[in-house]
From Swiss-Prot:
Positions of region (Disordered): 202-282, 430-695, 740-759, 781-813, 1117-1170, 1187-1206, 1214-1236, 1246-1265
Source organism (scientific name): Homo sapiens
Key words of the record: Actin-binding, Chromosomal rearrangement, Coiled coil, Cytoplasm, Cytoskeleton, Developmental protein, Intellectual disability, Phosphoprotein
Protein name: Protein Shroom4
Subunit (UniProt): Interacts directly with F-actin.
Tissues in which the UniProt entry reports expression: Expressed in all fetal and adult tissues investigated. Expressed in adult heart, brain, placenta, lung, liver, skeletal muscle, kidney and pancreas. In brain regions detected in cerebellum, cerebral cortex, medulla, spinal cord, occipital pole, frontal lobe, temporal lobe and putamen. The expression is strongest in the medulla and weakest in the cerebral cortex.
Biased composition (Acidic residues): 1132-1159
Coiled-coil ranges per UniProt: 1382-1488
Basic and acidic residues bias spans: 470-484, 498-509
Chain ranges passing through the membrane: none
Amino acid sequence: MENRPGSFQYVPVQLQGGAPWGFTLKGGLEHCEPLTVSKIEDGGKAALSQKMRTGDELVNINGTPLYGSRQEALILIKGSFRILKLIVRRRNAPVSRPHSWHVAKLLEGCPEAATTMHFPSEAFSLSWHSGCNTSDVCVQWCPLSRHCSTEKSSSIGSMESLEQPGQATYESHLLPIDQNMYPNQRDSAYSSFSASSNASDCALSLRPEEPASTDCIMQGPGPTKAPSGRPNVAETSGGSRRTNGGHLTPSSQMSSRPQEGYQSGPAKAVRGPPQPPVRRDSLQASRAQLLNGEQRRASEPVVPLPQKEKLSLEPVLPARNPNRFCCLSGHDQVTSEGHQNCEFSQPPESSQQGSEHLLMQASTKAVGSPKACDRASSVDSNPLNEASAELAKASFGRPPHLIGPTGHRHSAPEQLLASHLQHVHLDTRGSKGMELPPVQDGHQWTLSPLHSSHKGKKSPCPPTGGTHDQSSKERKTRQVDDRSLVLGHQSQSSPPHGEADGHPSEKGFLDPNRTSRAASELANQQPSASGSLVQQATDCSSTTKAASGTEAGEEGDSEPKECSRMGGRRSGGTRGRSIQNRRKSERFATNLRNEIQRRKAQLQKSKGPLSQLCDTKEPVEETQEPPESPPLTASNTSLLSSCKKPPSPRDKLFNKSMMLRARSSECLSQAPESHESRTGLEGRISPGQRPGQSSLGLNTWWKAPDPSSSDPEKAHAHCGVRGGHWRWSPEHNSQPLVAAAMEGPSNPGDNKELKASTAQAGEDAILLPFADRRKFFEESSKSLSTSHLPGLTTHSNKTFTQRPKPIDQNFQPMSSSCRELRRHPMDQSYHSADQPYHATDQSYHSMSPLQSETPTYSECFASKGLENSMCCKPLHCGDFDYHRTCSYSCSVQGALVHDPCIYCSGEICPALLKRNMMPNCYNCRCHHHQCIRCSVCYHNPQHSALEDSSLAPGNTWKPRKLTVQEFPGDKWNPITGNRKTSQSGREMAHSKTSFSWATPFHPCLENPALDLSSYRAISSLDLLGDFKHALKKSEETSVYEEGSSLASMPHPLRSRAFSESHISLAPQSTRAWGQHRRELFSKGDETQSDLLGARKKAFPPPRPPPPNWEKYRLFRAAQQQKQQQQQQKQQEEEEEEEEEEEEEEEEEEEEAEEEEEELPPQYFSSETSGSCALNPEEVLEQPQPLSFGHLEGSRQGSQSVPAEQESFALHSSDFLPPIRGHLGSQPEQAQPPCYYGIGGLWRTSGQEATESAKQEFQHFSPPSGAPGIPTSYSAYYNISVAKAELLNKLKDQPEMAEIGLGEEEVDHELAQKKIQLIESISRKLSVLREAQRGLLEDINANSALGEEVEANLKAVCKSNEFEKYHLFVGDLDKVVNLLLSLSGRLARVENALNSIDSEANQEKLVLIEKKQQLTGQLADAKELKEHVDRREKLVFGMVSRYLPQDQLQDYQHFVKMKSALIIEQRELEEKIKLGEEQLKCLRESLLLGPSNF
């Protein structure tokens, strides 16, 4: 571990003897991951060379540097004869003692594992997708993580697990780049991509289920968190320290946090001495240490809260800590360490949070929210169930300061941490958002573990009460600071991510994209967060923003900022200390890891991966929850009091701002944990100090609980239930959550459940198809661009500052309502997969009351776990409903703040996790949950009621719950139908709830245009295909039927318009829209249906709030009647045309679908996602039934998507993988909700279109690996057919665009989406052109080889024999080209036939005749090919007589590659042609649309 995990060594490898070379490649540019060796055949040439290893990344072949294209590498390798010279890059991971007992054990059994052991550091130093090669990422502790978890929910193993869950267990035995090495995954580029993506994301502990990983993550917080200084002490103390920590921690914790901020002697001293890490220290330390460097820096400045605050908070903390320790008492060693570690590590925690956040973000990236959950849950469920759970609790369940070090130390590899810190810092930007979810995960689990810690010891609750009293007083005296502190303490004591998260959230806002998330996560886990929060509190809204920005910067490389900002509290020394502590903790990491991993392994063996994840954590939480429940009540009251009440206008504002912000971040990152822990911790911690702080983190949902005075009881009940929920059964989650939904305080529990469920769903989602994962990875890697996210985050930050006031009044009740709604069936369904949805709901809900508090969206994310549906509700809240801008900004924020999945209660979307996607990949997309945010829309009608009865959560929740339930069910079903999209996993999870979103959904959709847009962005392709088809019918039926019920809320009709109005923040305008829509609805269902179809068609693009929404809204209001009239007329015609086209396209797509299934969607599989983004516009343009049947058959339904939409989807799909990633991440983030503003249309058509796009593109996507298949004509033919289909559709698209786009004003969002899509397609085209150039070089090289062979033959052969050879080579070229040409023409004719109207008999006859002719010609060409093949044998026999073996091999290679290269060239040309046509269509549509706009 002395070598930096990030260091590489380049190894020259020379293989001789000709193909086969005995190794398999995976990854590549096509899959957005490094091109690595996934398998080495035993006894093969590669194995005999003894130089190549699994996981090695190819950087040079035969002197030709690789740009990462797998296709290029395959061509070069196939072009190599006799000798293959490679240069591979592998991580320098010196062999070092295993980081855990598991590793050691594995190594004992597997010598290979021992050799691989040097990789653990690599693995832990996972190279982030953003910054490192996935091959490096794959290097996670293979033996440990692989061995520890065979679950499919492992972060890295999500794909791998899918492919070979069994192998996941042995992956660790594979070489350092374990994931890349998976032989089973080798051929699945997607798998490689996904696994690699996951691996890099969670290199530390990619597999939540993996004991090692989880241990690393969860144990990380252990003493290993020496960087924090105190953690070491705590760690050293071990169990006794735990008890000690109980007492020490309160003051230490408090002081530690301030010390973190101030780098006080105590904290530093503790931090400085690397105490022998308690076992979890090793794992935690690796993570925490890695995180320590960053988080410490970020954390220490963060705690500039006055010493007074420290003291006052410390008293509270002591009470809380004793509670905590009481709870942890049972798990004294783990918990004690975790506590003390966290407590003392608070500054490190901040740092750690930075790095952890980066690390976790990496983990979360790959693992996603579920992964983090899994990780935590893994810890809990492992033999360390108690210790590990306690550890998780201590590290995760502990207050963030405790948790931060512990939770962040989960990864023991300190070297990894060092490199990770670097990587993390690099990735912080992109990973921060992701980090938050991991932290969230960790914290969720942390909270759960914390609760577990408290589970046996309800003393924490009583102390919490005391603390609450103290905290209330303190908060009143120093509310702002105390709140920050409280936030920090909440983070510390009860992983109140809100607080910690709130602080980082502020940071995150500064560095909106990843900083928001990372900051949230950092804050979640950094006691320092309290300091920064304190500072934020001190600074209040202005400082909050600044702190947010500063902390955001800190998160990544902003640690210096925070240092400067916090008065340089944190300095490089902290980081140095962090590194030193890391090393020391690494020394002790083995012990902790061994014990934790051993226990985890036992637990994992005893329990299923899911049950382990769920049960371990859940049971702990269950026990803890009840104890926490009473404090929860107190906490809720306090929180509500503190947030709602009086702490002081400024404190209140700050609290809200901080809480909202923290909540957005914290809930985003810690929503589940926070919900879980917060329910208990908040109950526990909130009673005194937490009221304001809890409000910070739990403000939204705590307020919601607050409205119900019985919240404590509910919390109790919920806690109890939640314990049950936390069992990982979606049903359990759903049921308790339903009850919890009704119960205010249970919301936190619900969130936990949601989180657990989400994690579960995440695990399921992790099993998403490789193509989906790959798409997600591409999105995350390509569209990881944090530019959009930062902006959104910034918005969130601002909004948060604004929204604290409204949140007080509206947000709380809304939260309750939303929470209830979310907890109900929707929660049940979405708890696993729908948690993100809830987050969205919650965000929206929060937004609703806080019209200008867009951060509520983030906040919603923060309190998302509790108020996922709540988010929806707050959005629905009258304010939000009409303050569409806020809600939109929230949704945008949420989408942008993707960092934690909007729907995943701040965690990375389980779906994303399941896909091993990065949060930046857009959880929204992951979850078609933004649609749920739409529940805000459909709650619009209820909105006023909700607003009016905001204090009556039951009322609002029920309607919204129904709405959410209704919408998600259908929505999810479509998603489920779209198995190809990355949404399939979570789609299924989400579709669990058979919500009939018909009536409520449409209104929701209207308001939730944002939500929908997010959702659409999430799985534009799937959604578009499915939603389009289903929405067209369902929307016409249900929306129009709803029209009567929604007449008052005609939003569905003009969901997007309505969204815009809302986005304009003009409730009146929105209402005017609503009235106008009602008028439209009243005009007639037919007209409405036409209008709806037209509008949805007309407003296909998700609409992120345009910059000038006011102007847009006014413009729309001015043109609304005219547009409606025109749309009514146009739509009637358009619908007729589209119906016909859809029928045709259905046939075509069915064909394409069949073909697609046969074809490997390599370029287009991920592109199909992109298509989704394009499709959303078209989908919106064309409403389709939302029936489950349609959704499930959305893939077929997508075929019914208008040709324009479909072709558009196809085109975009073709080149959309990057686009989708790009759109998904940026556009989705920038305009997630609006994207699906059409509501029903959005869902059904979104899924349909998305799916159709996916399918078509997958159809079109030629087998990327076809280059070496010279005679794969059938496959190519299928591809050609699909492409021809697409081309035909593209030809029709301009007309469609004129009808649809021309007929409807082109939304600003649509234009932006199209622009982004154009950019994405352009990037894809650039990659294809580059590949084409490389292919041309290969062709030239092969031609040169042919000339050489010809010269050699000419010298030795007879003239007539040489002439035979010459003719054969020429005929081979001609025949191959002829076959390709005829197959392509025939495919186009067939596509034309499929798309032709049944009435056009004459044209059909012509096409049939042409088809017959081409079929005959193709048969002749095949005969010619067979003849040429026979001649080839004869020529070979002749040539073999004259040429020596070497030259004969050259001849064989030349002949083989000649046809293969021709086919490959043709495929690339067609792909490029398709991309160019797509770009042309998009540009034309951009020109067409605005004219009518």
